[in-house]
């Protein structure tokens, strides 16, 4: 018996450019049919609002999530989803595998890899910060709209092993896991950056645009649960 169905809304299916005032009606009808069928079968809905579907226009025109403007574009999309289907959803994920912004920036945050090198930490973590703020503001919006359901954070988990039993190898493993896996949920659940990220930012010359309003919204609108995907044991 299927009790819960998790599925994702494609931002670009509803708003192909990402900044339209009105949604694509064919996309709306498509999702209406899914919600209707699940409710008819008595199946609870676990909805992911953004699953690697940053509209290409926003990637190419403003640089994806490294631009603060993305927060407002995302919230316009989120407001439509909440108003259209909010009363039918039991569990919410504003962002799928949010730590993908670190290990796969193009998929996670719509960052295009520079042609002359690799991604730079300044852009990667700035983009993640703006997603954290958008996540918190989505929860704030849902509370103002009296939307039922609970909101969670989600990361992609990997299984790492130290090279040897030596303390230095185990410590290196812990530090890598902190950045790769845990810090995103730490921010979304606790409402602030953990101590180890401050050290990491200083060491890597990362200076984020974080406003007082950002800090307040992160602290006030944290997630209700932690979730993760886990595809393999090694």
Regions found by a protein language model. Give the residues of each.
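Glycine-rich, proline-tolerant flexible connector loops at the mouths of alpha/beta enzymes
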Residues: 9-23
């Amino acid at each position: 018996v299927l009790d819960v169905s998790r599925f994702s809304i494609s931002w670009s299916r509803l708003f192909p450019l990402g900044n339209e005032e009105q949604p694509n009606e064919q996309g709306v009808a498509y999702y209406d049919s899914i919600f209707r069928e699940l409710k008819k079968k008595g199946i609870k809905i676990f909805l992911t609002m953004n699953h690697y579907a940053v509209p290409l226009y926003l990637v190419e025109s403003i640089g994806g999530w490294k631009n603060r403007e993305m927060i407002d574009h995302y919230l316009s999309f989120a407001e439509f989803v909440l108003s259209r289907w909010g009363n039918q959803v039991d569990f919410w994920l504003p962002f799928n595998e949010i730590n993908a912004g670190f290990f796969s920036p193009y998929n996670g945050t719509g960052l295009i890899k520079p042609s002359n090198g690799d991604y730079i930490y300044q852009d990667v973590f700035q983009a993640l910060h703006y997603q954290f703020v958008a996540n918190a503001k989505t929860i704030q919006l849902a509370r103002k709209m009296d939307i039922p359901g609970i909101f969670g954070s989600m990361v992609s988990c990997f299984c790492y092993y130290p090279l040897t039993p030596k303390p230095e190898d185990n410590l290196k493993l812990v530090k890598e896991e902190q950045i790769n896996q845990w810090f995103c949920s730490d921010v979304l659940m606790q409402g602030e950056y953990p101590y180890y990220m401050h050290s990491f930012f200083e060491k890597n010359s990362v200076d984020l645009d974080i406003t007082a309003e950002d800090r307040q919204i992160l602290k006030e609108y944290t997630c209700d649960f932690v979730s993760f995907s886990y595809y393999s044991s090694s």
